[in-house]
Amino acid sequence: MEMDKRIKSLAMTAFFGELNTLDIMALIMSIFKRHPNNTIFSVDKDGQFMIDFEYDNYKASQYLDLTLTPISGDECKTHASSIAEQLACADIIKEDISEYIKTTPRLKRFIKKYRNRSDTRISRDTEKLKIALAKGIDYEYIKDAC
């Protein structure tokens, strides 16, 4: 399965800065009934720990335009508490995905927009995003415009 353009467009416009990789995993599970093939322990450019989820030919971080670097086994010790916390969150999400979506307002809003926004509107938002990024306009401005 390919990366979903509708999720990517909404994540980068209306929901920019609101989602993380756990949210993307939850959305994919809810919308497509797909579980990740692999879990990757990573850090972002600031050294903050984050779990990334690998699917057939894409990762959850790609929906958010995040560049994550996988950590080595030795580095796992440094991030042990974050690993435990995020794995526990992932397990809670997987246990009852529909309840998790219902109790998380931003994901509930995302699902509603995903299901109710027309392909034309999402395509238009994606075009605005491409044009704005080419001109060097900030994501926050784009989010407000969409």
UniProtKB/Swiss-Prot annotation:
The keyword Membrane applies. The chain crosses the membrane at residues 10-32. It is a single-pass membrane protein. Its main location: host cell. Keywords: Host cytoplasm, Host membrane, Late protein, Membrane, Transmembrane, Transmembrane helix. It is found in: Host membrane; Host cytoplasm. Induction: Expressed in the late phase of the viral replicative cycle. Belongs to the orthopoxvirus OPG112 family. This is Late protein OPG112. It comes from Vaccinia virus (strain Copenhagen) (VACV). The gene is OPG112.
